[in-house]
Amino acid sequence: MAYRNFIIIIGLFIGLNAQGQKREVTVQDVWRGTFYARSTSGLRSMNDGIHFTVLNGREGSIDKYSYATGEKVATIVSAEEIKEKTGTEISFDSYQFNATEDKLLLGTETESIYRHSSRSFYYIYDLKDASLNRINAEGKQQLADLSPKANKVAYVYENRMHIQDLDDPSKNQSFGLGKEDELIAGAVDWVYEEEFSFHKGFYWSPEGDYIAYYQFDESEVPTFSMDVFGEGLYPAQDVFKYPKAGEVNSKVSIHIYDVNKQKDYKVEIPETVEYFPRIKWTTENDELVISSLNRHQDHLILWEVEVEKGGLEVEKMYEEKAPSYLDINDNLRFLEDESFIWTSEKDGFNHLYHFNEEGELINQITKGNWEVTKFYGYDKKSGYLYYQAAEDSPLRRDIYRVKLDGKGKQKLNKQSGWNDAFFSSGFQFYINRYSSSSTPTYETLHRSDGKELRVINDNAATVDRMAKYNLSDKEFMQIPNADGTPLNAWMIKPQDFDKSKAYPVLMFVYGGPGSQTVEDRYDAFNSFW
């Protein structure tokens, strides 16, 4: 009996001791997602600004939620409902509302092309009468997009632009030049998708009377082949057009198609340019703005194109040059008075500027030796612009709002680290996604003035798991380079670090453009090596 009690006591001691010890991180822990922090994703704000929708892949439904409570309030539609009402069985993996939110464009059987681009079979579901129409191309289509009035859908099929009239199929239209490995209309080539970070190459005008689109001629671009290792025993070979440095790029032109007259206009730019990294309609139905770059990417021009009777009028609206290169962004916003907001690094730092319709500066909205890192938008009701900036430290991000004249600036977040905002339509609410180097993603709902309303996601399970491991915090520091410029860096030392000993060092550096790796934010993988 005494022996048995001794064994029990020893066993309890070992168990308690094991519970008190923290685990060491293994490679398996890192890459199987032990420290993964979940975040809300796929939220789409509805027109009313107080509800959002989420695609529920497990249930095959599009669900409606309240921002204020986080509770589900309705199911917009489900695959089961579509089958019951139309007799057609579909499993959708993407969706898009029309402007009035009474029709849905549903993507099915989606397959990837490159990093961002894909093909799908598309259906249009009418929420009012429960009718279902399929885009009538024989194969999968790209980039289907409902017109502003939702009576037409435009898409790319076999490298050409097509319009399907949902009321009268006899009025379907095709335009642009398309041929595999040579001509593309409405989509973009590999260079634009990868280097300019967009893959949709056409846009409806605000009232749906015109479509502006890209036309590519890649017939002279050299091909590149690459072995792709998939599920098979042997790799498949992927062959595509790829211009290496100094080789020929695609010849690109911008066109405007008049949907009512079924007439195509090529935009004639009066200067020689290499790239058109962005096009965007203004608030006017017949005004398009095209951005152009030279091959060195140090000279940018915004061109205003106006559709007139019998043709197009093109004039230079804004011009900017840089001694090195100019970054491309999606921060161009047109206001109702035809003025526009633009971000530029022309004073040495990226800031917000307000220009009139002639491209003349009204005022610089933000100033200082720091960067505006994101522009969320302009709320015309309150007169505030919302943006993210690295004002306090390049390692961190904070959320601000400021009036159009540059006055009334407010910092909206309280916690120090990495903050990002996701605003509702109309800027009534926003979700703040916060983290730091030692704090997993923590998401909260706020009013537009910064007042916190509720916690959405605290990643408590991840925090509990981290507490069981022997972890060291990141230490941030600065290292001078050859000319004395301080470079930000971080280091993670063992918990029992002894400065008198020598240790092996694992260096991690990525020097690509537009990439920052020294950040005070949570990284579930690289911070746990």
Where are the language model's segments positioned?
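Bacterial N-terminal signal peptides that target proteins for export
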Residues: 1-7
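Hydrophobic h-region of N-terminal signal peptides that target proteins for export
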Residues: 7-19
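Alpha-helical structural elements
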Residues: 8, 26, 185, 235-237, ...
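Beta-propeller folds
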Residues: 20-423, 428-429, 437-441, 445-446
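Serine-hydrolase catalytic core recognition
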Residues: 199, 223, 280, 285, ...
